[in-house]
Structures are given as C-alpha cells and as structure tokens.
Amino acid sequence: WANSPFVLQRRTFWYYQGRLRWIGKTPPENTEDLLSLIEATITQEQAEVQWAMNFTAGWIGVFDEQYRDRCIELGKRTGLYKDEKVSKGCTPNYLPDFIRIEYNKRQKD
C-alpha cells in the first residue's frame, strides 16, 4: 500500500507502520527501509500522507535509539509542522519536539 495510487491507502500504510511502534510491539525489521523511503518522498507527498509518514518517523525516533538523531534531522530538514500552533497539553507534530517530549514521557515510567 505504500505505493498505492490512492491517498487513503498510502496514509493507512504509514499510520499502521507508526502504530506498530507506538503500541510497544517490537519494531519490524523494515525500519531502515521505511526511514529511507520517508526521507526520499515525504516532501513530495500529499498532506494527509505526509502527516502519517511524519507520525511513523516520530515513533521510530522515540523507540529506536539508533535512528533517533536521523529522525530529528529529518524534521529539521523538512520543517514540517515547525510553525504549527499546539494547544496546551498536546504534543506537537514537529519531529524534534515530538521525539523529545514523547521520549522523555517514557523515561519517567
């Protein structure tokens, strides 16, 4: 579904990949390939798919220490959601902030 001509299928694919990591399962062995694909295509994608790709990169950065800096750099390089206003108590979508906040939350547990 990652290469589907349908936006909804692409968005679903990326959301599912992020969700696999978010729910605490052992990350699949496709993380390197996913991250490379995100880096290569996120800026050309539809906004709905960009969000889901960003979501996946965020959770990779939170849970996979070896990819954390790479995910943060991706956020800095693309600037996606950097200027997005976020309500108090909500986590921003901007990758550097998202990863820092979500990672720190899990360190307190």
Task: Give residue spans per PLM region.
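Alpha-helical scaffold domains
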Residues: W1-D109
